[in-house]
Design a protein with these regions (language model features):
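Short, glycine/charge-rich beta-strand/loop segments that flank catalytic centers
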Residues: 64-80
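C-terminal, well-structured catalytic/ligand-binding subdomain of enzymes
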Residues: 1-63, 85, 89-246
Length: 246
């Protein structure tokens, strides 16, 4: 419906609370509490239109982790945009996540859409807007800045912490809610500033397909059938795998 992720939490409250407990088991209570605090502070000054929705979810769940898990982007995944078909594999190191997946039906200003998601998660990672487009979000490579992976990761986190642009998962949800068609979605995902690099895969109902490779304020678009994991298809941008080769 039109009530968003907060309403989904009300409909599936036990599943949402189970997600928070899975986060605690995977990351430990102290780590989750610290990242939740930092995430809450960042979202408070972020331009995301969904920050208040996350606040409502956190208040309803009354558990540590809602803010952190909503801006967590530490996953690996593979997507293929082949004509009118979007293929998606999720190989995330988050035990138990698959059992909590739901398909939620939403209504945006541009029409209805289906969100493959989890109760308590506000953004969109994989979705379908019938008659308009389907799309998925993958994590981009980590930029090469030094020869030491932890140092590069820390530099990127500090850069993200200073950004006011919306997270990529929030932009993808906004596209599903407001983009009129495939071309409109591509333009939106190509041009809207985001907080960190990302990879968007899209297909359209008339055989269209595209991969949108994004940095914070720049983009490279590949039209036609492509497969992308967590590496750049272009040869202009450098990057390193994030623990899993792709």
């Amino acid at each position: 419906g039109t009530l968003g992720a907060a309403h989904l939490v009300e409909m599936a409250l036990p599943h949402a609370k189970r997600m928070m407990e899975m986060g605690r088991r995977n990351y430990s209570g102290p780590v989750l509490a610290l990242t939740d605090w930092r995430s809450r502070r960042w979202l408070a000054r972020n331009e995301s239109p969904y920050a208040a929705e996350i606040d409502r979810i956190a208040k309803r769940l009354d558990l540590t982790g809602a803010h952190a898990l909503n801006v967590s982007f530490e996953w690996a995944c593979t997507s293929a945009a082949v004509g009118p078909v979007l293929l998606r594999a999720l190989d995330w190191p988050f035990d138990g996540l698959g059992r909590a997946v739901v398909v939620a039906r939403h209504q945006g200003s541009a029409g209805p859409w289906l969100n493959v998601t989890w109760p308590g998660f506000v953004g969109a990672l994989t979705g379908l807007a019938p008659g308009r487009f389907a799309a998925a979000l993958n994590q981009a490579p980590l930029r090469y800045r030094t020869r030491v992976f932890p140092v590069d990761w820390l530099i990127e986190r500090l850069k993200v912490s200073r950004s006011r642009a919306m997270p990529p998962a929030h932009l993808l949800r906004f596209a599903f809610e407001t983009a009129r068609n495939f071309d409109h979605a591509v333009a939106m995902l190509r041009d809207t500033p985001i907080a960190l690099p990302a990879l968007f895969s899209l297909t359209g109902p008339d055989g269209q397909a595209a991969i949108v490779e994004r940095q914070e304020r720049s983009a490279i678009v590949h039209k036609g059938s492509e497969v992308v994991a967590n590496h750049w298809l272009n040869t202009e941008w450098n990057g390193r795998p994030r623990g899993i080769d792709s």
